Regions:
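Nucleotide-sugar donor-binding/catalytic module of glycosyltransferases
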Residues: 1-148, 154-155
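Amphipathic alpha-helical repeat scaffolds of TPR domains
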Residues: 166-178
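C-terminal, non-catalytic tails of nucleotide-sugar-dependent glycosyltransferases
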Residues: 147-166, 198-214
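Short, solvent-exposed helix-helix connector turns and helix-capping sites enriched
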Residues: 11, 161, 218-219
Length: 219
């Protein structure tokens, strides 16, 4: 086929999800279609959350990258509440063995898109497991998440999407600050990520309008 979607092993989707996303993408000439998602317990009970996806619309790839800088940006980062045109994977691959592969790649997919169709309905059901990646506060999780955000900040700086560069760097700093303990290997990776953060901060400080106070507090 010419379209690709992903489903996490713990989750499930509405029967019509992929058909709706495909139709939205084709009708709008989009290279990707994204829907909202709902948080649920393992037995299917809804967990109240307010989604930032409130209307059907069509956005450019740059506009989607800017939404990665906004509140509740994880609705736009996750790899699974969407349908991708297959050709987007000619230039992008998920990193092997990472817990936060979507942190490393969401912006790269959006950068290739001329148009992204947004469908407001929550058709993906994100099951909240006590032992899931998103609930396990580990050094590895924090460090790998920070590394992905810093790669995104670096990319955004290179392509002058400054709002995304700022937000990604700040998010990474928050994860770095709270990454405590761990194995010697994890601590070594953390040191490398901190060095990467220092290099990006040096570049950010040269961008007019960046709030240096926030960087200083985080460090």
């Amino acid at each position: 086929g010419e379209w690709i979607g992903f489903l996490d092993s713990d989750d499930y989707v509405a029967p019509e999800m992929y058909e709706r996303l495909y139709r939205a993408a084709v009708e709008q000439g989009a290279q990707m279609a994204v829907c909202s998602f709902a948080y649920v317990t393992p037995d299917g009970r809804p967990i109240p959350r307010t989604s930032p996806i409130t209307k059907n619309e069509v956005l450019s790839g740059i506009q989607m990258m800017e939404r990665l800088a906004g509140p509740q940006n994880w609705y736009y980062i996750t790899a699974w509440n969407r349908l991708y045109q297959k050709k987007l994977f000619d230039a992008v691959r998920f990193p092997v063995g990472k817990l936060h592969e979507d942190e490393y790649t969401a912006h790269l997919f959006y950068w290739q898109c001329e148009r992204v169709a947004i469908v407001k309905e929550a058709m993906y059901y994100y099951v909240q497991q006590d032992g899931s990646i998103m609930h396990t506060e580990s050094v590895r999780r924090r460090v790998e998440g920070a590394a992905g955000m810093l790669e995104r900040a670096d990319f955004a700086l290179e392509h002058e999407v400054c709002s995304l560069a700022f937000a990604s760097c700040n998010g990474a700093l928050g994860r770095i600050v709270f990454a405590k303990g761990g194995s010697e290997e994890e601590r070594q990776v953390l040191r490398q990520v901190r060095e990467q953060a220092d290099r990006i901060i040096d570049r950010l400080l040269r961008v007019p309008g960046y709030r240096t106070e926030k960087v200083k507090v985080a460090l």
